[in-house]
UniProtKB/Swiss-Prot annotation:
Binding site for substrate: T126, I127, D128, R163, M170, G171, R172, E223, R244, H250, V251, Q252, R253
Annotated coiled-coil segments of the chain: none
InterPro entries, alphabetized: ATP_PFK, ATP_PFK_prok-type, PFKA_ATP_prok, Phosphofructokinase_CS, Phosphofructokinase_dom, PKF_sf
Assembly and binders: Homotetramer.
Protein name: ATP-dependent 6-phosphofructokinase
Binding positions (ADP): R21, A22, V23, V24, R25, K155, G186, A187, E188, R212, K214, I215, N216
Reaction equations catalysed: beta-D-fructose 6-phosphate + ATP = beta-D-fructose 1,6-bisphosphate + ADP + H(+)
Keyword ATP-binding carried by entry: yes
High-level lineage: Bacteria, Thermotogati, Thermotogota, Thermotogae, Thermotogales
Amino acid sequence: MKKIAVLTSGGDAPGMNAAVRAVVRYGIKNGLEVIGVRRGYSGLIDGDFVKLEYKDVAGITEKGGTILRTSRCEEFKTEEGREAAAKQLKKHGIEGLVVIGGEGSLTGAHLLHEEHNIPVVGIPATIDNDIGLTDMCIGVDTCLNTVMDAIQKLKDTASSHERAFIVEVMGRHSGYIALMAGLVTGAEAIIIPEIPVDYSQLADRILQERRRGKINSIIVVAEGAASAYTVARHLEYRIGYETRITILGHVQRGGSPTAFDRRLALSMGVEAVEALLDGEADVMIALQGNKFVRVPIMEALSTKKTIDKKLYEIAHLLS
């Protein structure tokens, strides 16, 4: 193997740049030519390639986002789109591909290998932390710290004004960020897709706490469970006073990655290159315990990552 490519796809996650840096520099150290694919799978189809040298990735570990840019590519979901991508790889003599992204990106990588025998290795990068067989995905720790910091600031104003704040965080199918952020900030309630919410019971809890002298409340809701406005409507009707809504939105994706995310991304990038050099394909790099391992992409994607209900109960008890 003499030439490989790397791309970032789907929603950006803090730490993607660190992974790109590791792939580029470790690849070059092992005698490989490394090509960067701009704009994810869209760039792969269009042939938007750039040769990456050692100096091109200097100083990017601490930067959020992705220097390669990213996209969500509908065309790549079609057989014709994947065929066009495979032709571009073969045209440019690229013998292996590292894909950094979430569930959709990794599914695309698997199909590219299955249909066109392209050696691919996936690196899980998504703030939802919803990829199976890996303890953590790149970007999760940074996102969690961003959310925690925002909630702590909201608690200051909630206390000053004696208000209930509803904080909506990302998580279309997974409540991981909401659960962990709610736990570490002492939120009065956490609403996640995995566990049904009883608004009457929730309102009773808030009113009970208020009678005990708790003058402010923080309710953390994952976007996939309900919108903050829906939660506010249900609660205001039952508790009899106005709430305030904060939707954190895309701020959760940005920012300089934490030390944990940098280390995770750098290690996964190195392992991805080693996997290609070892002749492996259609695998994802995963963190299991304190070890980095290679697992089949579809096995990871078909393994449902469940919420730790004990943590949910602990968060409820400690609120």
